């Protein structure tokens, strides 16, 4: 895909949604961190359902630590990998309380030192909370980038590096959310909605439906 076509695609996304938002519901930095940790291998809908209850009980490092591992497991048991996620959340809460003065770290190295926080999670946190032009590549972004021909790559790191290089700075903060929403509701894994897709004419996918 050439530079001109990419710019047209991004311009159409901007025209349709000039201020895309993450679909996770949160009211503090720590709540977002927990929500993103919980979202691994799960849906935002499921995470929001769980945190709607959990955050009324515990939504700070102190209250999570007071809640403890077993009770935390009880609140998130309907989500995948809940044992691992419970342990990661407890350990991350401890580090944030003891090492980072109860504040979510604002740089990648410190973020990725937290249990349960990998590159994708760090990219989301840096983008949403700290206004950084990071591009998190999840399954939706990976699919849309490859399928449309926008930024092809064999793995998420390859796609991320390519997108960082080719996406103009004015669009960098938004492109993750545009592609996530597009992959979630239009360019889905199986039920493609090409006939109603607003970038269909620019898309280079050769098996449109």
Curated annotation (Swiss-Prot):
Domain HhH: 108-127
Classification via InterPro entries: DNA_glycosylase, Endonuclease-III-like_CS2, HhH-GPD_domain, HhH_base_excis_C, HhH_motif, Nth
Iron-sulfur recorded as keyword: yes
CDD domains: ENDO3c
BP term (GO), one: base-excision repair, AP site formation
GO molecular function, one term: class I DNA-(apurinic or apyrimidinic site) endonuclease activity
Cofactor binding, note field: Binds 1 [4Fe-4S] cluster.
Reaction equations catalysed: 2'-deoxyribonucleotide-(2'-deoxyribose 5'-phosphate)-2'-deoxyribonucleotide-DNA = a 3'-end 2'-deoxyribonucleotide-(2,3-dehydro-2,3-deoxyribose 5'-phosphate)-DNA + a 5'-end 5'-phospho-2'-deoxyribonucleoside-DNA + H(+)
Cofactor(s) required for function per UniProt: [4Fe-4S] cluster
Residues the entry annotates as binding [4Fe-4S] cluster: 187, 194, 197, 203
PROSITE patterns for this protein: ENDONUCLEASE_III_2
One Pfam family cited in the UniProt record for this chain: HHH
Domain of life: Bacteria
SMART domains attached to this UniProt entry: ENDO3c
Keywords: 4Fe-4S, DNA damage, DNA repair, DNA-binding, Glycosidase, Hydrolase, Iron, Iron-sulfur, Lyase, Metal-binding
Keyword field contains Acyltransferase: no
NCBIfam families found in the cross-reference section: nth
The family this protein is said to belong to: Belongs to the Nth/MutY family.
Record-linked PANTHER family: A/G-SPECIFIC ADENINE GLYCOSYLASE/ENDONUCLEASE III (PTHR10359), ENDONUCLEASE III (PTHR10359:SF18)
General function of this protein: DNA repair enzyme that has both DNA N-glycosylase activity and AP-lyase activity. The DNA N-glycosylase activity releases various damaged pyrimidines from DNA by cleaving the N-glycosidic bond, leaving an AP (apurinic/apyrimidinic) site. The AP-lyase activity cleaves the phosphodiester bond 3' to the AP site by a beta-elimination, leaving a 3'-terminal unsaturated sugar and a product with a terminal 5'-phosphate.
Protein name: Endonuclease III
Organism annotation: Buchnera aphidicola subsp. Schizaphis graminum (strain Sg)
Source species taxonomy: Bacteria, Pseudomonadati, Pseudomonadota, Gammaproteobacteria, Enterobacterales
């Amino acid at each position: 895909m050439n530079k001109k076509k990419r710019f047209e695609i991004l311009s159409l996304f901007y025209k349709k949604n000039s201020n895309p938002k993450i679909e996770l519901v949160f009211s503090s930095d720590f709540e977002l961190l927990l929500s993103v940790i919980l979202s691994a291998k799960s849906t935002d809908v499921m995470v929001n359902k769980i945190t709607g209850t959990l955050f009324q009980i515990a939504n700070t490092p102190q209250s999570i630590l007071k809640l403890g591992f077993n009770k935390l497991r009880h609140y998130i048991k309907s989500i995948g990998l809940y044992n691992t996620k419970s342990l990661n959340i407890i350990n991350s809460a401890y580090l944030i309380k003891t090492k980072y003065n109860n504040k979510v770290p604002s740089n990648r190295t410190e973020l990725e030192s937290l249990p349960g926080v990998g590159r994708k999670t760090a990219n989301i946190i840096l983008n949403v909370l700290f206004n950084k032009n990071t591009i998190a590549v999840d399954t939706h972004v990976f699919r849309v980038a490859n399928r449309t021909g926008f930024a092809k790559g064999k793995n998420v790191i390859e796609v991320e590096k390519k997108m960082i290089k080719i996406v103009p700075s004015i669009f960098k903060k938004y492109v993750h959310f545009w592609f996530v929403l597009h992959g979630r509701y239009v360019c889905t894994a199986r039920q493609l909605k090409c006939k109603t897709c607003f970038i269909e004419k620019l898309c280079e996918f050769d098996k449109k439906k």
